[in-house]
């Protein structure tokens, strides 16, 4: 009996020694973790001034030392129906879900890849062609190199692909036109390289569309199902999904974006273009028309609390609570600066030089990494200060400033709130 009891105790101790329990987020007052509350709360008035000036909404959450110290929403999830200002606009709340745009690249695609790398199911030095049959140089290609492209080249954005081929717009895409997922993969294979791979960095949506297809090839699952069932559900995330309107969410739970579909107030036209105010559907054209709302480069929706958990996973070195997705070595591998450009990791943008000041401000540590999204989203993760910031916004939910001059500049994009670094600096400047 004594031997059995001792053996049981030793076995329990042995198992607990190997069990990993990661920090989970709790709330704390700013003063408890080194902030000057009065300075931090000055942001309140400044952001409200930006809302009064026409910025649609801002949702902000700040993490310090495993604590949420600030979480607040300003403005409106929906204030327009087309060009008409609503008599009773829908206020944003801290539970409002936002179109993450290119932050999808990190919190869907990169998280999936980091998990698969940790599990030994993929190596970043593998050739792309290992996972995508027929991915090779085409006859007549002026620039060769697809045959030798590795996943790491795609992650570093040095693969040679153009930034935005605009597959769903036949007027621009020409022979590469596609408004179906299966056709889009074939068009990606046919997309000519614009520069010799490895010769420069060009941030490209195509790179992450390819990575999404690679994840689906490895897992034999659609990208959304894979991340939602193996990453978000184990973490207890309730509001992080692709195609939210197909998964039980309703428009009032989500921040609206462009006023007239993807027409930029009526100056852009192509077959099947949406013209209604976008509300609960991904704004990105390639993600919506060419990929059915689920793509490696865009399509994910979330709220600030769920995003905080995902950022805490990175600060924790790969896990949260009793859930382990990957390890600290994987985090280091993916956030290490590219030797060619210090502002790129493996997908992650890194605070490598002054060019990242508009994103990360001037006070974040050089080791800070994160990403931005075209709809008005920022994630900033600072392992030195053990701090993270998420800003979610719906910047395109305002008129286009001058559609004929530049259809991609919205009135709200001309306001200071559109520059994330300023907000980030006010937060860091509030540290004692």
From Swiss-Prot:
GO molecular function: serine-type D-Ala-D-Ala carboxypeptidase activity
Name of the top EC class for this enzyme: hydrolase
Catalysis performed (reactions): Preferential cleavage: (Ac)2-L-Lys-D-Ala-|-D-Ala. Also transpeptidation of peptidyl-alanyl moieties that are N-acyl substituents of D-alanine
Coiled-coil stretches noted in the UniProt entry, renumbered to this chain: none
Classification via Pfam families: Beta-lactamase
GO cellular component: plasma membrane
Record-linked InterPro entries: Beta-lactam-related, Beta-lactam/transpept-like, Diverse_Enzym_Activities, Pept_S12_YfeW/YbbE-like
Main location: membrane
EC number: 3.4.16.4
Record key words, sorted: Carboxypeptidase, Cell inner membrane, Cell membrane, Hydrolase, Membrane, Protease, Transmembrane, Transmembrane helix
TM regions (residue ranges): 7-25
The keyword Transmembrane helix belongs to this UniProt entry's keyword annotation: yes
Subcellular location: Cell inner membrane
BP GO terms, sorted: proteolysis
Topological category with respect to the lipid bilayer: Single-pass membrane protein
Family designation: Belongs to the peptidase S12 family. YfeW subfamily.
Protein name per UniProt: Putative D-alanyl-D-alanine carboxypeptidase
Gene name as annotated: yfeW
